[in-house]
């Protein structure tokens, strides 16, 4: 019979139980009681998620999709591959050790973090050196298998594959080629798979999403010998590709000595023919037809029509699946009592998507009539969504159609603008600033919760937030920062805040997804044409500016990031939606400028994240992404300084496009990479001003002034002092004030030291 399965389920819990358990554990100093509570929470979440999968009608549950912090880090823990610099005993690894690698400790900074392919999930980057070894690691996966079997479930295990694990890492300490470590890594995987077979696991899903990339020949050539070494003695192996088209590797993948393949038909439907043609008789083909990355309800009839010919060709060897892990969507639509009822009928979260997979399996096996009610409901929802009047705004469509190339460019060149801005602001060499947000304290959260619950009225809430702005301004003046921010106390999230104020967006109550570790985000839903009904940030920025003679930046989230960090409508091109958002932000920048705000930051941390995985598709994306930013930023006068911020980005390959944004100042995250990101600036003459991050805000570790001074001096080797800013890596929302106070005081001290050295080195 055709098998229904998913590639993974969200691990955070319907009420973010894992987040809160992690934070309690860290807050309690990793005590024995806190660890027991955390372990119990993880066990309960896994049991609940498997229950959802079973009750939906899936043929197996997935184990190994759970991780305490990150599934790449967990895979490293399973194969004894955590960075040697931490000095851990791989076979006796504790949770405290695991979290030290993720978050850093007093002796070592945290592992670097970057985006998982083109998603908004962040993984911890493996560190590989000539001395790297692999071997037996933690028992967590086997514990999960035992848990699932004890609950009566048929378990399919899931692992990040060896090729992907190596690809995702960075070579260090003279290692020339990561593939040189493959002969050491394969035996560790082989032993892991053999143990899974001994534990009674029939199938193991091996995630190899790198086969959706443009792979070098050496990596392609490594695939067959790797899986020839893994297959003997292992359970049946299902090699899973996702996130893009893997058809250029179809012949290679079909020839692997494995029991099945998985392909993503949501992101790359056209690849199906390349896989079905001459498909080996000894393999299953898992078709990812239910979207694992977006929240829109599946058009079941359309999906059934797509799968029926595959069933006719392959029979029971067709498996029905989600396109990728459901890690990227919220847990359960049932927890959205306040969402608009019509909109709700258009949606499916992880729990609903598991049922969509099973319903498609049932229709393929028993016929559509067996699940007619579910199919009819889905068809009605799809029809209503196509025709709903709430989606279309003729005014917005006219404004987008009227845009010209000139609307996306500043009136004057950077050199002219820079002179006007120097005259207006009179900033010192190496000006210091922050990225935007300050700690979201318990006081802020209590006030927001009281306001949402109706306990605190609107005026009371505004005064509470104004008090937090006053605190933020006073602290920044005490540190001695040159350019200030208002601290964003009123914002629960840099995208959701704007989504609440823009037409065409909807906000969920509990639509949380994991960004990294305990960090969760609640992406808005972009369901219709986007329009700005009234100013969003002017009041807060104006109030903050009234408290200081120093410039205060207005803070906006850019159009591409708004798009990337939302669940976006799929009934029009993403480029069109980006332009709609850009027009709304353009109006906001003009309103800020009119109110006297002279610096406006338009954050685009997700610019590179949106880059297509295929090189051939990138130029078109960058064209519309740069245009959207230009539309948002280019209406202001020469002496209004436009800032932008990017984080977690390795963007050497897109520096020309970043330069084309023509922001007066760009800040980037560089601390964890020890300024390696700036290597690209040695060969590319970036024309505008830049602030490489000198303080890793993702770790509780507080740097001292000497450490920050060293980073500033490293940056000066690549960036002229006249164009260098000093700032943290990212916003400070997740840190505590005691950490921020110490770190920013050290940052200002370090900047003053270096400023003095630079000025003394310049002849009078």
Swiss-Prot record:
Q: Which reaction does it catalyse?
A: 5-methyltetrahydropteroyltri-L-glutamate + L-homocysteine = tetrahydropteroyltri-L-glutamate + L-methionine
List of residues binding L-methionine: 435-437, 488, 603
Q: Note the coiled coil stretches, chain numbering.
A: none
Q: Is Repeat among this UniProt entry's keywords?
A: yes
Pathway it works in: Amino-acid biosynthesis; L-methionine biosynthesis via de novo pathway; L-methionine from L-homocysteine (MetE route): step 1/1
Name the keywords, alphabetized. Amino-acid biosynthesis, Metal-binding, Methionine biosynthesis, Methyltransferase, Repeat, Transferase, Zinc
Write down the top EC class of this protein: transferase
Q: Which residues form the active site?
A: 698 (proton donor)
Query: What are the BP-aspect GO terms?
Result: methionine biosynthetic process; methylation
Q: Which domain of life is it from?
A: Bacteria
Disulfide bond entries: none
Residues that bind 5-methyltetrahydropteroyltri-L-glutamate, according to the entry? 16-19, 115, 519-520, 565, 609
Q: Which GO-annotated molecular functions does the record name?
A: 5-methyltetrahydropteroyltriglutamate-homocysteine S-methyltransferase activity; zinc ion binding
Classification via NCBIfam families: met_syn_B12ind, PRK05222.1
What role is this protein assigned?
Catalyzes the transfer of a methyl group from 5-methyltetrahydrofolate to homocysteine resulting in methionine formation.
The molecule here is called 5-methyltetrahydropteroyltriglutamate--homocysteine methyltransferase
Species whose genome carries this gene: Burkholderia pseudomallei (strain 1106a)
